[in-house]
Amino acid sequence: MNNARPIRRALISVSDKTGIVEFAQALAERGVDILSTGGTARLLAEQGIAVTEVSDYTGFPEMMDGRVKTLHPKVHGGVLGRRGQDDEVMAKHGINPIDMVVVNLYPFAETVAKEGCTLADAVENIDIGGPTMVRSAAKNHKDVTIVVNASDYHRVITEMDANDTSLTLETRFDLAIAAFEHTAAYDGMIANYFGTMVPSYGENKEGDEESKFPRTFNQQFIKKQDMRYGENSHQAAAFYVEANPQEASVATARQIQGKALSYNNIADTDAALECVKEFNEPACVIVKHANPCGVALGKDILEAYNRAYQTDPTSAFGGIIAFNQELDAETATAIVERQFVEVIIAPSVSAEAMEVVAAKKNVRLLECGEWTTKTTGFDVKRVNGGLLVQDRDQGMVSLDDLKVVSKRQPTEEELKDALFCWKVAKYVKSNAIVYSKGDMTIGVGAGQMSRVYSAKIAGIKAADEGLQVEGCVMASDAFFPFRDGIDAAAEAGIKCVIQPGGSMRDDEVIAAADEHGMAMIFTGMRHFRH
């Protein structure tokens, strides 16, 4: 029976007590003797479950305020003892085999996240006995079952019932790997927390004694899916997600229909969704190759989609479409009747819209749930031999943050367009130039080495689609180092420019705007995106 091992004795000691009473009761009903410690033992006893305190079992009391509970040969010998090989020495020392260990660890992450957490608080929430038991049981998975996740309780009981209270080697091995993942994540959290308090190992230690970035960067992600290939067909790939992502995202999205998401689908969908999150009004973002090619607001998402599509229908073909409100049947119909689309994502999708999209079975339809606030965290970029780590770019200016530096004041409509345009530029690859008017992108110039050429491309895009640049606002993700970009914008018909400012030649650039009768707004915030 696949090296099945019966469960006769279990040791249970958990910090997270979710489902533990029901699980322990199920074990007891199947004839399993239960050992336990501290608060877990008290909880089980209060619920009428027969339990033996570990201190009674070992003949050695808990001591040092609970620091020493399970660190005893009768415990670890029972867990580590190899059945059929160590039986004689176990019997000689009165060590009974322990067939199952159910442990999860002190809530270190929750403790250090609390306001006012002291170093002493953090230290006291470093679990010692727990990880030791977990690793011992996982090492001896040939004979012992280790359970660290409450989500596995039902699975364990179900298999025991199917196998005369036994668990297979395949299950024990799978649970053992989960246990090593559990302790690895736990130790990583501890190393990250204390690693912010010490200098780096490298030569450049200046100013990093107290840093938000730990000395070693330890992160754990869980594989969600293997992929046919990566960015290109000769590259293998997989998609990993955070253990408990809190923010609605492509990682949390539920796929309603369509082919499996590809590597590029996920990257582009993330770009589209994060951009559309910037807007409160009904909005649509269409992305191609990680760049917005059309963004617009509307009285509803249908109007927003129609206007976003109008920016660049050619690039929208085979693109990703994101909305910030529920996808309805009317909008879904407009999409599938008008264009080929790879992915549609929205906070929710109406039943009627699902029926519409179902006619195009290859279209990937996702709903990600509503978002409230953005979570903090790091962005990472792999370089050969290393990793660049930075805060997520969650910066965004409001009307009160804007500084008008030109002689001409922008109109109310220009200010509104400037803020819209600025939000879009944040998500366009640098050098980024965006033309907009009336809450709609008119032209997008992305990823050029020269800012002037990005502006030219934005103008060409607009002209190709018959869109009027005259009177538009222009956003630039970074400052203009020379006046040539402003001269080119004026020639195209731009009337207002929003940019970070901060160039050594700001005076020259502002003077150019004044010469052309343009309004110029500084944000004081840059949004490079590489």
From Swiss-Prot:
TM helices/strands, residue ranges: none
Keywords: Hydrolase, Multifunctional enzyme, Purine biosynthesis, Transferase
InterPro entries attached to this UniProt entry: AICAR_Tfase_dup_dom_sf (IPR024051), Cytidine_deaminase-like (IPR016193), MGS-like_dom (IPR011607), MGS-like_dom_sf (IPR036914), PurH-like (IPR002695)
Source superkingdom: Bacteria
E.C. numbers: 2.1.2.3, 3.5.4.10
MGS-like domain span: 1-148
GO cellular component: cytosol
Molecular function terms from GO: IMP cyclohydrolase activity; phosphoribosylaminoimidazolecarboxamide formyltransferase activity
Pathway noted in the entry: Purine metabolism; IMP biosynthesis via de novo pathway; 5-formamido-1-(5-phospho-D-ribosyl)imidazole-4-carboxamide from 5-amino-1-(5-phospho-D-ribosyl)imidazole-4-carboxamide (10-formyl THF route): step 1/1; Purine metabolism; IMP biosynthesis via de novo pathway; IMP from 5-formamido-1-(5-phospho-D-ribosyl)imidazole-4-carboxamide: step 1/1
Catalytically driven reaction(s): (6R)-10-formyltetrahydrofolate + 5-amino-1-(5-phospho-beta-D-ribosyl)imidazole-4-carboxamide = 5-formamido-1-(5-phospho-D-ribosyl)imidazole-4-carboxamide + (6S)-5,6,7,8-tetrahydrofolate; IMP + H2O = 5-formamido-1-(5-phospho-D-ribosyl)imidazole-4-carboxamide
BP GO annotations: 'de novo' IMP biosynthetic process
Similarity comment: Belongs to the PurH family.
Record remark: domains: The IMP cyclohydrolase activity resides in the N-terminal region.
Protein name: Bifunctional purine biosynthesis protein PurH
Upper lineage: Bacteria, Pseudomonadati, Pseudomonadota, Gammaproteobacteria, Vibrionales
Gene from which this protein is expressed: purH
